[in-house]
Amino acid sequence: HAVSCFLTRGQLWQNWKHGRDVFDRKLVDSDWAPNNGNWLWLAGVAPFSMPYYRVYNPCPDSKSSLNVEAKEASFIRHWVPELASFPSRYIFEPHLAPDHVQEEAGCVIGTDYPSPIVDRKESRRVNLELFKESLGRIA
């Protein structure tokens, strides 16, 4: 959910077909019907879509119901070795860690690990306005 929402109506405002195509190529269990249906639904462009203002946070913290892993972030620590030494408090959004924490973890954001590509809150606000405006045009 978070990936498709981030790519489309949540933050990047990209066509849902780009994400669908990547999933078609990369998923081991890719299936045309559910892949298309899910991308349409989560992009908010299908008649059966969820309300456009429901935007998933791509960076859930350890307390979020959308966080499917333990507080320890073992999945991130295993698969993203650059972040393995970050304190749990910052591992979901390492760019928020103070400089001294990044240095102690051996990973400076913007040098050793990419900086965020968008301001998540601002892009969400702008995209919600765009979506609301586009719905007004077809009503």
PLM features: residue spans?
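C-terminal catalytic domain of photolyase/cryptochrome flavoproteins
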Residues: 1-139
